[in-house]
Curated annotation (Swiss-Prot):
HAMAP family: Pantothen_kinase_1. It is found in: Cytoplasm. This is Pantothenate kinase. The keyword Zinc does not apply. One of its GO terms (cellular component) is cytoplasm. It comes from the Bacteria. It catalyses: (R)-pantothenate + ATP = (R)-4'-phosphopantothenate + ADP + H(+). The keyword DNA-binding does not apply. GO terms for biological process: coenzyme A biosynthetic process. GO terms for molecular function: ATP binding; pantothenate kinase activity. It comes from Shewanella sp. (strain ANA-3). The lineage of its organism: Bacteria, Pseudomonadati, Pseudomonadota, Gammaproteobacteria, Alteromonadales. Its EC number is 2.7.1.33. Pathway: Cofactor biosynthesis; coenzyme A biosynthesis; CoA from (R)-pantothenate: step 1/5.
């Protein structure tokens, strides 16, 4: 995969899995098998060996980068003659639907918390910043859910700006995958973390992607380090269909689920509907809005069969 893309060859250092794993440099494993089980997403097969080979070296890299930024901050405070300021380090994780962004984010959060320099690590997903279901229906955007126009970008940018500026308590809306909507009256409070991990489809987009105003600030303007989780589209579609079948047997069986009407489908019917959703919504969104932002990332995690990481690309 890495050899076919001349842009990636120009911009990134490429590591095969074995080469990357050596960079762990004796960082201890801090997760148990039970911990990992709690962090896995639906249809995810990540193992402790995957954590050892891929995520421990990445946590070491991020620790070194965060420490460097903390030191630069102290130098600036001393130069300005001011009290030490608090500005969270912000890591974004982007990628397609079904690629495993959420699992990657949860594993990194768990690992980064064990470093003494940054024990407070919060995780926020941009799903909560999707417009409420009623608004999407009113705007005719229900079939565009996940596309840039389905997000309340003003609210998202205001949230990330407030966190970055060091505000004591900042609230983020919470999304329910059962009701397919924001949860009214509930929020997640972010209180001056050392690191904030922001996970979502759209976190690498910039003002250049905006049809409205290229000058307005975007999430990427506030991000210190960005990660893109990548895979070939035929694998992503396959994983989405497999996940859809898992949901049909699990979450969709809940009578409160927005997709409860899918619970009684046969395997063939469920596969056909999942394929149609991919071909009409998730696939086009990937091709038009998500994948074009890939080479903006500081690091790309490339997945192959069975969700296993095959290569890591690190910006030069």
């Amino acid at each position: 995969m890495t050899s076919k893309n001349p842009i990636q060859k120009a911009l990134y250092l490429a590591f095969e899995r074995a080469q990357w794993s050596v960079l762990r440099d004796a960082v201890p494993m801090t997760l148990s098998e039970q911990d990992l089980e709690n962090l896995r997403g639906i249809n995810e097969k990540v193992s402790l060996s995957e954590v050892t080979d891929i995520y421990l070296p990445l946590s070491r890299l991020l620790n070194l980068i965060v420490k460097s930024k903390q030191q630069r901050g102290l130098v600036l405070d001393e130069f300005l003659g001011q009290k030490p300021s608090s500005s969270p380090y912000i890591i974004s994780i982007a990628g397609s639907v079904a690629v495993g962004k959420s699992t990657t984010a949860r594993i990194l959060q768990a690992l980064l918390r064990h470093w003494p320099e940054h024990p407070k690590v919060d995780l926020v997903t941009t799903d909560g910043f999707l417009y409420p279901l009623a608004d999407l229906k009113r705007k005719g955007l229900l079939q565009r859910k996940g596309f840039p126009e389905s997000y309340d970008m003003k609210m998202l940018v205001e949230f990330i700006s407030a966190v970055k500026s060091g505000q004591a308590h900042v609230n983020a809306p919470i999304y329910s995958h059962v009701t397919y909507d924001r949860i009214r009256g509930q929020h997640q409070t972010v209180s001056q973390p050392d690191i904030l991990i922001l996970e979502g489809l759209n976190v690498l987009q910039t003002g250049l992607d905006s049809p409205v105003d290229i000058r307005r600030p975007f999430v990427s303007d506030f991000v210190d380090f960005s990660i893109y989780v990548d895979a070939e589209e035929h694998l992503l579609k396959q994983w989405y269909q497999e996940r859809f079948l898992q949901f049909r047997k699990g979450a969709f069986s809940d009578e409160k689920s927005y997709f409860h009407h899918y619970a009684s489908l046969t395997d063939d019917e469920a596969n056909a509907i999942a394929a149609k959703i991919w071909d009409t919504i998730n696939g086009p969104n990937l091709q038009l809005n998500i994948q074009p932002t890939r080479e903006r990332a500081h690091l790309i995690l490339q997945k192959g069969q069975d969700h296993l990481m095959s290569h890591v690309l690190l910006r030069k």
